[in-house]
Amino acid sequence: EEMLFYDSPRKDLPYADWYLNAMSYPDSVTAKHHAATYGNAPYADFKPVFEQRLSEAWDPEAWADLFYKAGAKYVVLVTKHHDGYTLWPSAIANPNRENWGSPRDLVGELAAAVRARGMRFGTYYSTGLDWTFQLVTEGDRIRDIMRSAPSSQSYADYAYAQIVELIDRYHPDVLWADIG
């Protein structure tokens, strides 16, 4: 029997980076967790909470110290994952979500802290999935989820412009374009 993608909790699921997609499946563990914990609050409602916690707890200097003490030679930050939220105040506006990005430059702050300690800095950018452009909720196997990959020219232009912006602003030593 083929295992369903969201049929049971795992160490990295269901409350992690694919949360927005997973909560859209009504019978998934994530959807049940979300309903029990947050009611019917939409995913976008977490943006103010995230930004408030950032203002209180984000300490890129402490992160860089930890990486340096661990012997890291480089650090790669997820600058935009599949939910489309950017960790820098991008000049390239998301056409489907207003103000869908951090007002604080988390990428720049961590890049400066990492480089000040002699480590290299890289950026990860989800090129192949952005659920603010397309979220497929039919099916529950990984092959069905991959149908969420946006294929429009508007998305290609948007992603390209943001990647150019990342390169121009941060000069990453590593540029990781996921699923693209």
Spans of model-derived segments:
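Mature catalytic domains of secreted/periplasmic carbohydrate-active enzymes
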Residues: 1-180
